[in-house]
Regions:
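Bacterial N-terminal signal peptides that target proteins for export
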Residues: 1-7
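N-terminal signal peptide c-region/cleavage motif recognized by signal peptidases
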Residues: 14-17
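Short, surface-exposed binding/anchoring microloops in extracellular/periplasmic proteins
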Residues: 21-57
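Intrinsic-disorder/low-complexity, polar/charged segments enriched in Ser/Thr/Lys/Arg/Asp/Glu/Gln
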Residues: 25, 36-38, 81-85, 97, ...
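A short, structured loop/turn motif at beta-sheet edges
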Residues: 32-35, 59-66, 90-96
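The feature marks short-to-medium sequence segments in extracytoplasmic or secretory-pathway proteins
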Residues: 52-77
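Short, solvent-exposed, Trp/other aromatic-anchored flexible loops in extracytoplasmic proteins
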Residues: 69-108
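Edge beta-strands of extracellular beta-sandwich domains
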Residues: 109-118
Length: 120
């Protein structure tokens, strides 16, 4: 079988964004605050600057409905891992598990959302 190296190089080059690192969630803490919840999420991501950085994380239910979103306003090149919180997350009564996933500026999400037990 003869390999077409220019075609192979083009295929590898076009897949480069897919090979970028997605954010990794290391820890999630959840705390009841009145009728709402606060989540504190610890993320690790190889931020390189404004060209590629973890730019947010979201809280979703089992069906993927967004319950909250925390925008990350700048790269954390020299602060890894880092923790950021989101207040006033409304979790529907009776919901015992929510999920958190992080996003980066390259459009990648955490490989698998992290399940978080909602204390009752």
């Amino acid at each position: 079988m003869k390999l077409n190296f220019p075609l192979l190089a083009l295929a590898l080059w076009s897949a480069a964004p897919v090979l970028a690192d997605a954010p990794e969630i290391l820890d999630v803490a959840i705390e009841k605050q009145g009728m709402d919840w606060q989540l504190s999420v610890t993320i690790r991501h190889p931020d390189s600057g404004w060209d590629h950085y973890a730019d947010g994380w979201e809280v979703i239910d089992a069906k993927g409905k967004r319950l909250g979103y925390r925008e990350l306003m700048h790269p954390h090149v020299d602060e890894q891992p880092f923790t950021r919180s989101l207040r006033n997350v409304m979790v529907p009564d009776g919901m015992r598990e929510i999920y958190v996933r992080a996003h980066c500026s390259d459009g990648l999400w955490t490989a698998e959302p992290v399940a978080v037990a909602v204390p009752f």
